[in-house]
């Protein structure tokens, strides 16, 4: 499980680096994206796809399943490829690239790229520490600061990223989504099997380790593919030999 978390951390750093090294004309990100304001009644929220500030994980670790749904009011609608950020205590750096459609708390901001092809690039921009530091400069409140929506949209980034940057951030973000889903499957499997192992209900002596070895070979193949992605992602900036 930790392998996928660590791997995604590296991939996200690559995305950040790509966005940061764009040297074109800078513009406020309000030219690249908008904040979603679409709302629906809370009874339309589904637990599997509902995102709260609590379900978003600190230090840019994506999200986990929400523990409950709101009982009153409205929720914000998000779509696949939107970027969700908790607006409570921005210094916790809670951010997630949506891989599905769903709803979220009003304290979760939904950024949507005006050009869908730039959604991974937008995620790379918003994922940077410098963005969260910028948001904190405009935050209001002491015990529980909230970011200023207008202020954060004035954060600047390159307005017209190169095609290779768009392609690379897209490849990397797609792999991040795949890894997240694989990690979710393994987590669910662990939660089911571990109690059975502890109770002795499952006898490990009867496990077919040839299947396990086959799975490991597939993981090695996936790692080989990723080793090809890295030099593509950072042409001229990164070398696997460094």
Segments the model singles out, each with a brief description of its role:
Residues 80-132, 136-140, 144-152:
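A short beta-sheet element
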Residues 95, 120-121, 133-135, 162-166, ...:
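Extended hydrophobic-aromatic, low-complexity segments
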């Amino acid at each position: 499980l930790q392998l996928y978390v660590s791997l995604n951390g590296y991939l996200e750093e690559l995305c950040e680096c790509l966005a940061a090294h764009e040297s074109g004309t800078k513009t406020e990100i309000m030219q690249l994206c908008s904040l979603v304001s679409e709302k629906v009644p809370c009874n339309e929220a589904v637990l599997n796809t509902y995102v709260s500030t609590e379900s978003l994980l600190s230090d840019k670790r994506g999200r986990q399943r929400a523990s409950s749904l709101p009982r009153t009011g409205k929720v914000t609608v998000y779509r696949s490829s939107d970027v969700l950020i908790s607006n409570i205590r921005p210094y916790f750096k809670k951010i997630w690239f949506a891989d599905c459609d769903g709803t979220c708390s009003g304290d979760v901001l939904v950024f949507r790229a005006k050009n869908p092809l730039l959604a991974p690039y937008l995620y790379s921009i918003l994922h940077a520490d410098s963005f969260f530091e910028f948001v904190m400069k405009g935050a209001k409140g002491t015990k529980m600061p909230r970011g200023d929506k207008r202020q954060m949209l004035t954060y600047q980034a390159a307005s017209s990223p190169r095609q290779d940057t768009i392609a690379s951030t897209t490849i990397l973000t797609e792999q991040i989504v795949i890894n997240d889903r694989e990690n979710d499957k393994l987590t669910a499997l662990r939660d089911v099997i571990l109690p059975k192992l502890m109770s002795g209900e499952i006898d490990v002596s009867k496990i077919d380790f040839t299947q396990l070895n086959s799975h490991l070979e597939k993981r090695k193949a996936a790692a080989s593919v990723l080793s090809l992605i890295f030099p593509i992602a950072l042409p001229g900036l990164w070398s696997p030999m460094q």
